[in-house]
Amino acid sequence: MRFSIVDRGDDNSKRVAETLKKKCIDIGWEYNDEKSEVIFSVGGDGTLLRAIHTYIDRLDEIQFVAIHTGNLGFFTDYTQDEVDHLVYDLKHNQPKIEEFNLLQMDLPQVNETLYALNEVRIESLAKTLVLDISIDDEFFESSQGSGICVSTQSGSTAVNRALKGAVVDPGLKVL
């Protein structure tokens, strides 16, 4: 299996990443940044989000495993103290695959497409925005206000909740 590691950049995360790299090589895995099948994210949720955006064009080809060394770890699978357990699972157990929906936002005015695991926000503190909102190319509504926040199920507990939005069960297929 080919793998790569994205870490948060602090000394502790780098140390955990190096330990993980050595242990994975010891069980016969190949470290390969270019053709990875598994990406290990060592840090917190922000590190995982960065890793997802780094590999956004290959999401259907790779899987992510997150190791928590950061501040927030809602998406992390293992803690930094469980690296040996992780390597054991990689070698001996069938992994449980958990899929998360990504939110795609097309911005035709600037010819850009954005993807989000948590939420997409469009906001202005300086003036009122008037937004025409479409879902799957079908007009939904016009919105006038300081902005809009659209979240996925996993993002419903983040900024959306702080904005008094509903928390959505991850098993539901809704925004």
What are these regions (language model features)?
Residues 1-42, 49-57, 79-98, 106-113:
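ATP/NTP phosphate-donor binding region
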Residues 35-36, 59-62, 111-112, 144-146, ...:
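Short coil/turn connectors at secondary-structure junctions
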Residues 40, 68, 120:
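A residue-level signal for conserved active-site and pocket-lining positions in enzyme catalytic cores
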Residues 44-47, 70-72, 154-157:
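Short glycine-rich anion-binding loops that position phosphate/pyrophosphate groups of nucleotides
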Residues 55-62, 80-86, 163-173:
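A glycine- and small-aliphatic-rich helix-loop capping segment at beta-alpha/alpha-beta transitions
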Residues 60-76:
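Short, acidic/small-residue loops that bind anionic groups at enzyme active sites
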Residues 72-147:
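Catalytic core of DAGKc-family lipid kinases
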